[in-house]
Amino acid sequence: MEIKEISVPQQGVVADYMNGKKEIQSCFDYMLTEDAFKQRVQDLREREFFRQDLVAHLLEYNTKLQAGEATIQNVKALEDEDTYVVIAGQQAGLLTGPLYTIHKIISVLQLAKEKEESLGVKVVPVFWIAGEDHDMDEINHTFVTKNKKIKKTIFHDRNPKKASASESELSLEDCRKWIEEIFKTYPETNFTKDVLRFIDDSLRKSNTYVDFFGHLIMKMFMNSGLILVDSHHPELRKLEVPFFKQIVSKYKEVQEGLHNQQEVIKELGYKPIIETKSNAVHIFMEIDNERVLLEDNQRKFVGKDGTYSFSYEELIEEMERSPERFSNNVVTRPLMQEYVFPTLAFIGGPGELAYWSELQQVFHAIGFRMPPVVPRITITYIERDIATDLHDLQLQESDPFLNNVDKLRENWLSNQIEEPIDERFEEAKKEIIDIHKSLQQFVKKIDPGLSSFAGKNEFKINEQIELLERMLKRNVEKKHEVELNKFRRIQFAIRPLGAPQERVWNVCYYLNQFGLDFVDRVMEKPFSWDGKHHVIKL
C-alpha cells in the first residue's frame, strides 16, 4: 500500500472551518490546537460522570460482542477520573454500511492514540452505534457492480417490523441469501471463503441489525481497543434517565439556543441544516412500535398532532418506568453523548460538522461546552488496474477528484477528433434551418395550404441531422471503446454514482480482494488531520 495526500475542494462550513476562518470557528468552543485539547482536559476534570455504572454496562455489552483484551482494558480504564474518550457514531448499516463508517473508526483510533501520547492522559476510542434509528431504508442495502452498472442491493426481510435497529430482528436465513447474492457480484479470490466465514460467524451470533453490525465491527477491529456502545440499549437508557428529565425541563432553553445559533449561522452566510418546529421537545417516545417526536402544546407534551398527550408528571413517570421507550433527536443526541462520556473530541463527517455548528448555544443552554469537533479522515482506494487505466489515459491520480469524470471523458474524446462534433453539427443545423425558413416563406406565398407540411418537413430534416450526429458519435465511441471503458472503470471505482467512493462502496469488496487483514494494514498508514484527502494505492 502506498499513501499520498491531495487537496480536494470543499464547500461551506467544512471548507471555512478547515481553512481557519475565525467567524465559523467562533461557532465552536475549542480550536483544534494542542492548547485547546489541554484546556478540554482541564474542563472535563471539573465535571462529574457516572463512570462506575457506565463501565459496568460497557463491560457487559462489549464482552457479549466477544471483545478483545485491549477493549476490555480500555473499558476498565474509564473508571479512572483521568481517562477520556475520542468518539464518533453511525447507524448500524448491514455489512457495516459504506466505507466511511470504517474510516470514522480508523479516525477515532488514530486520534485517541495521538492525544494519549501528546497529552499524557489515558484516551480510549469509542464508537456509538445509533441503535434508536427506525429508518431501515438507510441501513438495509449496499451497492454492487452488476452487468456494467451500479446496483443498489436491498435486503428485504420477510418479517419487517416497525422497530429500532436495536430491536429489529434479522431473518438470518434471508440475510445469508442476501450476502451470497452480493458476493456473486465480486470476483472469487483466495480470500472469498474466509471472508464469507468471517461474516457468517458474526451473523450467527446476531438477532438484530445492531447485533450484526457490532459483531462485525468488533471482529474487524479485534486488537484495536475499540469500545462499542449501542445508544438504544435498555441498560444504557436507564443511566440516561436523569438527563432525559433535564432535557424535558429545559426544552424551551434548548429550542431557543438552537434558534439563536441558527440566526448566527445565517448572518455568517450559511444555510442551517437542522429543521425543527418551534415547539419541539427534541425527544422521541416509542408508542405502539412507532418513534413519535414529542412537542409542546399548551403545557402538555403531545405526539402526532395531539393523538398522544402527556402531562409533565406523566412523562417523567414514564421515563422512570420505561426508559427504553425514549430516544434523542439530532439536536439532543450530541448532548446525551456529552452527558454520558468524558469526551475529549468528537469526530464527524462533513455533514455532521455543519450541523454541529448550529449547536453551540444548545450545549450552553444545558451548561455544557461543545467538545472539540474534528473532521474525520477521508480515504479513497485505487486498485492496480485503475492506476493503470489512469496512466494509460495520461490522467493524474488527482484528476477524478478535481474534475467530473464524464467531463474528463468528453474532453479526451474531443481531443481524438480534428473538429468538435457538437459544434460542427450545430453550425450545420443553423445553416440548414435558415435556408429552410426562407424556403417555407416561398412555399407559403405560392400555396399557403402547404405551410403546415413545410413545418413538418423542417422537423423531419432536423431529426435526420440529429440521427446522423448520434450515429457518428456512436461510431467514434465504438472506435475508442477500449479507452472509454477505462473511463467507466475509473468512474465506478473512484466516483461511483458521482459520489465519493467512501459514500457508496462497502468494505467487504476490499476484504474479498485483499484479505481479512485489509483494515489492519490501512490503519498502519500515517494519516494527517489537515483536511487533505488520502489516496491509498493497493
From Swiss-Prot:
UniProt-listed HAMAP family: BshC
Organism: Bacillus cereus (strain AH187)
The protein, known as: Putative cysteine ligase BshC
Statement: the UniProt record of this protein carries the keyword Ligase: yes
Gene Ontology molecular function: any one: ligase activity
Enzyme Commission number(s) from the entry: 6.-.-.-
Top EC class of this enzyme: ligase
Family designation: Belongs to the BshC family.
Keywords on record: Coiled coil, Ligase
Function: Involved in bacillithiol (BSH) biosynthesis. May catalyze the last step of the pathway, the addition of cysteine to glucosamine malate (GlcN-Mal) to generate BSH.
InterPro entries assigned: Bacillithiol_biosynth_BshC, CC_BshC, Rossmann-like_BshC
Pfam families registered for this protein in UniProt: CC_BshC, Rossmann-like_BshC
Coiled coil regions, renumbered to chain: 460-484
